[in-house]
Amino acid sequence: SDAKQFGLCTMVSQDDAGLVIWPTHRLIDAGDIGETSAIKKIGKAMTMTEVTEEEMESRLKEHLFGMMFRSGRCFLLDNTSDDGNVMMRLDTYAAQQKILYGVYKSDEGKSKISYDAELGSVKKAMAEKKHDAAIVLNAPCLQTIWDLAGQGKRMPKKTTFFFPKIWSGWVFYRME
């Protein structure tokens, strides 16, 4: 139908001082993949440094991303190499390929991934042991987003969480 030819969007200038981009962290329900096994497999794919939760948060920007496990163990992670793949420099892509698909097999339905843009909420969920693991990401740089888009690259879903947002129901326009 004609109505399906259109999509609603919000346009915000990249130079707008109010533009904020948050990361969207990944929460993992691992199915039958145990923590010890996961850590061992991740350690083969990436460089892992065990840290406290506070250190993970304070030093996160110096690393590709962080991970928290149900046991309370926390790590900072980096690629051992990007094999010439520019996408592996993007934390969400490396996490998706090496951990979510590579270890937890979420692309095969062997684990469930949920998303949360608020670090405080992620930390609370992990403290309450609601998930097996969490991938804590850095806020994406706007220039990285533009560079990858300019190369025709697609970032993993929920790589970014942009503000400002239009309130749901705030704008009504009958599309017929």
What kind of feature is each model-predicted range?
Residues 1-176:
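Surface-exposed, charge/polar-rich loops and edge strands
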